[in-house]
């Protein structure tokens, strides 16, 4: 156990896996059956269910993933493995039925809904993130109840704008796009504001350069794009982080280190970028450099338990 229950927040799919197992133990029914009987059936959600790879589903979306040289099919995943943490399929139309039912007593009584939608630690309620839209964003002051998720080849975001009973659902079958920014643009349209122009992702362009011309050319391209087109691309720290981990997974440790070092240069106040650089140094066998960067990560983000654990392991070797 990482900490005393109720003292900190840490999202973990294992919690939802256990909740599914508890439901099965208490009711004597499978999780899939419970979903059909309690939610999908009563709400007429005919295009939602527990996914089985062998089933033929009309219009089933295929998942892809961004790699250095382009887009590839996402690796196969046996959907019995994520279980209650992520084995469902659905549609925007069905999720709208579910969303609207949450404003009634069809699924959950008011007392339980109050608990569901009350934030506890770090804005998180019972399975929902509950926040107020900042004053500088469209829909300022409204409560947004949301959740996102991802699995091989897919990522999603749902935002419930409870003041107006509006719903934003984004399904993406090539993970990597900033769905939060997309949702912000949709909110702008809903509230008759001008949405910000979409920004191009960095990974496809830099990835192609990495494959064809090497890491030095990719770093130079990044600097040139930021100089000449600062508003046209998404230059947040996650873009370079994603690129670095792609390289790390392919065993290109030195190239990954170069990309992570660029990210540290760009975002020196982020504990996460130092954490990533430390991981790359550790994988490359550069123990002291890994220790130095894990320490810096913890200095900037003392709550980073993973960095603390990795640092302890390295210092004990």
Please report, for each region that a protein language model flagged, where it lies by residue.
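Short, surface-exposed loop or secondary-structure junction motifs
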Residues: 1-152
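Helix-start (N-cap) detector for alpha-helical repeat units in TPR-like alpha-solenoids
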Residues: 237, 271-272, 305-306
């Amino acid at each position: 156990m990482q900490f005393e229950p109720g003292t900190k927040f840490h999202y973990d799919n294992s919690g939802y896996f256990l909740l599914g197992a508890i439901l099965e133990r208490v009711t004597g029914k499978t999780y899939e059956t419970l979903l059909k009987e309690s939610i999908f059936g009563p709400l007429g959600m005919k295009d939602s269910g527990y996914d089985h790879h062998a089933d033929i589903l009309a219009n089933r979306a295929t998942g892809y993933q961004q790699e250095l040289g382009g887009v590839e099919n996402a690796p196969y995943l046996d959907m019995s493995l994520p279980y209650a943490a992520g084995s469902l399929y659905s549609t925007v139309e069905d999720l709208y039925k579910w969303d609207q039912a949450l404003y009634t007593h069809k699924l959950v009584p008011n007392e339980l809904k109050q608990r569901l939608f009350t934030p506890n630690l770090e804005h998180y309620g019972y399975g929902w993130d509950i926040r107020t839209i900042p004053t500088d964003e469209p829909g300022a002051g409204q409560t947004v109840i949301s959740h996102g998720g991802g699995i091989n080849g897919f990522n999603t975001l749902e935002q419930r704008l409870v003041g107006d009973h509006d719903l934003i659902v984004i399904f993406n079958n090539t993970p990597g796009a900033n769905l939060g920014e997309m949702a912000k643009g949709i909110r702008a349209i809903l509230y008759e504001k001008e949405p910000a122009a979409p920004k191009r992702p960095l990974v496809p362009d830099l990835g192609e350069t990495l494959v064809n011309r090497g890491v030095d050319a990719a770093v130079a391209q990044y600097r040139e794009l930021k100089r000449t087109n600062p508003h046209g691309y998404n230059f947040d720290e996650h873009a370079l982080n994603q690129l670095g981990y792609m390289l790390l997974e392919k065993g290109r440790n030195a190239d990954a280190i170069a990309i992570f070092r660029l990210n540290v240069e760009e975002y020196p106040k982020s504990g996460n970028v130092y954490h990533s650089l430390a991981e790359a140094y550790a994988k490359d066998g550069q123990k002291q450099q890994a220790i130095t960067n894990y320490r810096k990560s913890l200095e900037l983000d003392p709550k980073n338990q993973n960095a603390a654990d990795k640092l302890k392991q390295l210092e004990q070797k």
